[in-house]
Amino acid sequence: MEAKPVPAPQPRPRAMAEPLHIQRLEAALNMRPFMNMAKRSLRKPLSSDEETDDEHVVKREHDVQDSDDSSTVGVVRMKQSSKRKSRLLASKEERQSVKAQLYNFNDLTSDREWLYDLLLSDTESDDPTITEDEYVQQLLREHVREQRQRKNYYKKAANAQYAYYGSGLLSNHDIFAERQLATAGVRKRRRRTKQEILMARLAEAQAGPKPPKQRRRGRKKRDNMGSPESGEVPPSELGKYTFGDTLPNNEDDDEDGGEVDYKRELASLALDYPEEEEIEEEVDVEGGTEGQVTKVRRKRKNPAALAARRRRIWQIMSKKESGRLQRIKSNNHKEMLANCKRVAGMCAKVVRQRAINSQRIMKETVWRAKRLTREMLAYWKRYERVERDQRRKQEREAEEQRKQDVELIEVKRQQRKLNFLITQTELYAHFMSKKLGQGSEEDQLRILSQLDEETNARLAAQDDYDAGEMKLLAQENAEAAMQRDLDKTRAFDVFAKKKEKEEEEQAQESVEDIKPEPRPEMKDLPQPKMFKGTLKGYQIKGMTWLANIYDQGISGILADEMGLGKTVQSIAFLCHIAEHYGVWGPFLVISPASTLHNWQQEMSRFVPDFKVVPYWGSPAERKILRQFWDQKHLHTRDASFHVVITSYQLVVSDYKYFNRIKWQYMVLDEAQAIKSAASQRWKLLLGFSCRNRLLLSGTPIQNSMAELWALLHFIMPTLFDSHDEFNEWFSKDIESHAENKTGIDEKQISRLHMILKPFMLRRIKKDVENELSDKIEIMVYCPLTIRQKLLYRALKQKIRIEDLLHLTSGSTTTSSSSSASNLMNLVMQFRKVCNHPELFERRDARSPFFMRCAEYTIPRLIHEEGLIHRMLPSRKHLLYNRFNIFKSEYIQRSLFEDVNVNSCFGFTRLCDLSVGDMVEVTLNGLIDFLLHYRRVLEKYPLLAYRRFWWKKQPDSRYQLLEPMLENKLALDYMPPNSVLKNFIFTAMTANESSVYAFGDYFTYNMQETIEHRVIRSKILKKKTSLIEEMEDVSKQKLEIESVEVQTKSNAKSDVKVTTLLLLPEFPHRPRKPRKYVCEPLSMPRILYDLGQKVQAVHRYLYCDSRSAAWSQIRHNQCENSQGRELVSSGLALCKPHGGWSSIVVPDKETLITDAGKLFVLDNLLTRLKANGHRVLIYSQMTKMIDLLEEYMWHRKHRYMRLDGSSKISARRDMVADFQTRADIFVFLLSTRAGGLGINLTAADTVIFYDSDWNPTVDQQAMDRAHRLGQTKQVTVYRLICKGTIEERILQRAREKSEIQRMVISGGNFKPDTLKPKEVVSLLLDDEEIEMKYRQEAKLQSSSPIPAATQSERKRRHPQKDVNMGGTTIAATSATQNPDDDVPSCSSAAKRIKLETEEDFIDVGITSSASSVGTDSNHPTLSQETYVPGATCVQQTEIDSENEALVVDGDSPTMLGQNESMNFLDDLSGISPMRRRHHPRGTRRGRPRGSTRRGGGHGSIPRVLTPTQAATPAVPATASQAAAAGTGAAAGTSSPLPQQEVSGGGDNAGVPLHEEEYRTSPSGQSPGVSCKRGPGRPRSKTATPISRGTRGAPRARRPMGPLLVPLGRSPDDTPPSSSPATSRAPSPLSGSHGAVGPE
């Protein structure tokens, strides 16, 4: 009986399958089959009879299999296998193919085919009609069947190798082949029993005779699926095994064993028949080899036996098979009934569903009708509301248009006022120009025409402007102002008689009768005769201009460039007044302290006729000088004094004495000293009684337009009387243009020039003086040393973005000024690092800690027994000395009395030691031992010399005594020039060498650089022979490069080119690195030059013993003179590398090498001194000047020093010495003290060690050398550290230096007011700010928020809960805690909130952020809360002078007496800040512009505190305004007062009583329900209950702006240009009234 064929699975690679439990787990978790089944079930109709038919077929197949006997088993299995193949190819093919891939069916045997069916079968659903008892019976039958199958399975010995029954189906190969062979082995074929043979013959007899099989020699090899394994039972013998009943619904155990009983009866029946005839046939032996034929004997049955057997079989079938078929029929009937019931239930379900749907449709029809009715009603209501809103909108637009007209008229009125004032000023200047002979009637008409403007027909009813009336009024005011000036001037005039009559006639004439055509051109006045000197042409023109404005009673500003002789022109003008008008004073000259002596010298030099009083000195000296102020004979030549020269400080201190005299003329030198109109100096000098004022300033406009106004108001108080108006005229627009914010009005600038023209005269050097030498300015970029880099990096790492933002977000002027001072301290620390690191910490001399050891007394016994037991006074002298074996007598007897070779002292003959030498070495102590060693060392060189030169002499006994002489490496044996001496380390250490080892190193070949070529060319250029060599090379047509150095001149616009011939470049030939083997290597100095930490003096010993005293004396004297000499020489050899002194004095070279600037300066000064130049070195820090002084001492440069601490008398002498003595090489000056008024033309080189904030200060300093009288070319070197804060400071200075081109010649500028944000931009550049910002954001995002903080935040900010019906349950107030007793509207509640709440900070577009300060030292900061999403912009001005920023004293720092040197101490109290990554209104699920507690167009206006009202309000965006409004309203439990607020957002100006509904936490009015059910329309939007706050969609803002403004400051931004900024509401908004900007 052959095994049925099994379909072979798809071939796939042989690999170990996954374990069964993992496969089941993956199958259980795989949702794809479930989804596919769901799709199929949804697509398939509800009634399908295919599955039931298949189930009936399967059951019938099972029944037929049970009913057939063993002879039909193979046929049934063949049918099942064919059906199995059809099932695999049916609709379940995909699932069975997947299952087939999970198992290995290659070695499937017949006894495990049922397992194949089980694995590939689908799981059947339970029968719904089966009862619980039937289910239990079925479980029991399955259990019995399982036991029987297990028993039959293990009967085969081949199956013992498997761990479980399914083994072999889970893997493609057997991993325990050895165990399989050991278990199964080679089995013999089992012989069949007679009963088996009988049963086989009966089966063959029923089948009928078969044709004999023919031999097939070439039969193909059987398939692997049908061939049994070794030790496995072949499929033909499976009949003898009983596998039990496989029907699923067996009812009892008797039926299970029916097949076995049936076979037994057949066997017993066959034994009763007689023997049949035997037939021999040739058949193939199963399991044999191919072609093997055996003979089998078979017995043929007779007809009677067959008939009896047939009868027996029919009886059995009638008894047992009929009942079984009946049961099958009943089961089929039951299943049919169950299917019918199931179909009936489904039909009822469908009908019921249709009924429900019809009912729902009926209900929805009524509901839809109602909803349509509501929608129609809502539509018409909405139509009426829209119509009403449209009407209101038109009315509101008309009202707004009326307001805009009123505002436009007001703006025009302000513009007309400013225009009128400017026109009046221009008209006044025109009248003055006419008096000077420069104006015309056309200019007057042009000026008056500026008051005309076009009329607007729409505004004609409200605008009453009359241009003609304004022209008359402006002309009258200008005439009145000029008349007042004339009257004031006339009161001071005391002329000669010939001039008095002309003055009276001029006074009677009115201003209107001024001749329109005065002198067509001013003629230059002659040089005064009393002036002892020669004026240049431009100086005479300047004196003439001064005389003309003096005639007209006008004060002026002589603003010639520095170095053009303003002092000489003013002195010549004073001589002209005295000579032409007969007015000899009194004249008051006020100048800085450094130029007082210069004025006195110039006066005595050029005008010796003037009586000059130098008013300075001590109070007693000044009191004596005031005695000469006799007011008799004033204005005459016989007066006691004509000119008083004093300083600004003395004028302020002695103001009461100066104000008693009516000065004829007051000259203020370096007038920028009164640039601040708020200073006491400016106010006191303005109150002086004088006829005219003259201001001398090389830089009249240094920083801002306010300084220009201060100077103009000082010379003409009646005209420029309003600082605010002047600021409105020019300052705001020009400064905005300078900061690249707005465009510049060229017409406005031209009008400003027109105003300044009569009062100011300015010439520059290149226009008036062609004889002045050139000036070259060179920027020298210096690198930072390692020490500077470490300090600079450490300072930078301590800067935090939050700290800078906290400093830049001050709310008051006081906090802003303190923030600016703190930031300036940071800047000063960086500048110190760039100048020299020793400004922080000096390298002082270090010495070890000196300590004295404890002194104690030694008992006599210890001293005698332990120390002097070998000396003569000792009692044990005989024991230690007399009886010693090294005694001379004993050694003598041992050697010579009885010559004994074995004597213990026989080695002395080989060592060249005598008896006395032996005693000295052993008994006389260390001194004698060292002396003996010294003698031996002196003898070795002699022996080596004798051995080296006396070659013919035979070897002496020293060969035996000194065998080391034969060593070739002996130091004494080596020649003097031997290289081997380098390997003797003792020689190197004795010579204080740092060689510590020998090793290998490499040298690499590199190409020559241009610097090396320049150095070689400069050296060769000095020798004529080398120049000739260069000419020879040029003749050979070699390429010679040239380096061109272009120098720009300030006096001339040409360019000089100097050529330096360079030597030919060395040809570069790449070579391999050269290796040096076994070369001495030096040790780093830090390893052998370390200073001691502790040093102790030698200990003194005391003992009550005379012998101890004698031994100490002998020890101190080293026994004898030879011992002293030996000790001194030994100490000399033992001298350390750095000497015996333990004090470590820093090397002066480190002073140079520690700073990159000083290192560059050292090389520069060396070159300048070699070329014969003289140098001025400027620095702002006096401590830096101290370091430069130390450097000058170190380099032996002769120098002088002048700074703010120098006395006035000493300054004069120092300047005179430097001008006259040529041996003084360097003049060290402070930029502020030594940069004004002094003449240092003896120097031709100026070096700025550090640059000033103000470029004009540096310009004045360099003009001390580049001025009249300078004959050499002036070179200016400016030392700048590359990549540091100095580069940004220099860039700012360059922008500020263009102010003169803006105001005087046209241009732009930067103001000098250092605001905190600008100082931050100096500290960090754009990349560093962005990098620090990203790092901080990354740290904040990565840091986990504690659970307690999250729970607390959720408690304070609960989210809104929205139910399905549409009712919105509002969140409680974020600021009011139900557990607190304090009301949320009080200030105490706000303080509690600020102390506990942690919120994020959102940064706006303008990059200005504000933080919540919790420091108790700043109450103004702690009382203001900040709304997330809002940005604080504060307009603060710091009107401070530069002297407050850089102190020119002993210390350059900004710290007070009690302040620490740590510049970050003020930043320690800054609270941590967080940044909101998602601004409100931009998160998912919320519309743009909306917030958590309000919409985009919030209706609640913001309430500002008086602190906020101090600064102009800036309109905010809709989202930020809503956030601010809702934040203020959420914490208010009562309605706000009915006050209008301007600038509160979109609804500014709306009374607060209309917005009371917003004040409740839920946003609804109290007592009104707003629930809306399904289908109900929304409430009317016009009511306050559900008024929408959602605005129109707008573009998203950038998420990550920079925190610090770089290009411009938001403080000066007009409100209309910064829509993204808004002020944060005050915590007291619920209790205080609203205050808006006026």
From Swiss-Prot:
UniProt family annotation: Belongs to the SNF2/RAD54 helicase family.
EC number, UniProt record: 3.6.4.-
Protein name per UniProt: Chromatin-remodeling ATPase INO80
Coiled-coil positions: 136-161
SMART domains (UniProt xref): DEXDc, HELICc
Binding site for ATP: D560, E561, M562, G563, L564, G565, K566, T567
Subcellular compartments: Nucleus
Subunit structure: Component of the chromatin remodeling Ino80 complex.
List of residues that carry Phosphoserine: S47, S48, S67, S70, S227, S230
Function: ATPase component of the chromatin remodeling INO80 complex which is involved in transcriptional regulation, DNA replication and DNA repair. Binds DNA. As part of the INO80 complex, remodels chromatin by shifting nucleosomes.
One Gene Ontology MF term: ATP binding
Listed PROSITE patterns: DBINO, HELICASE_ATP_BIND_1, HELICASE_CTER
Keyword DNA-binding carried by entry: yes
Top-level taxon: Eukaryota
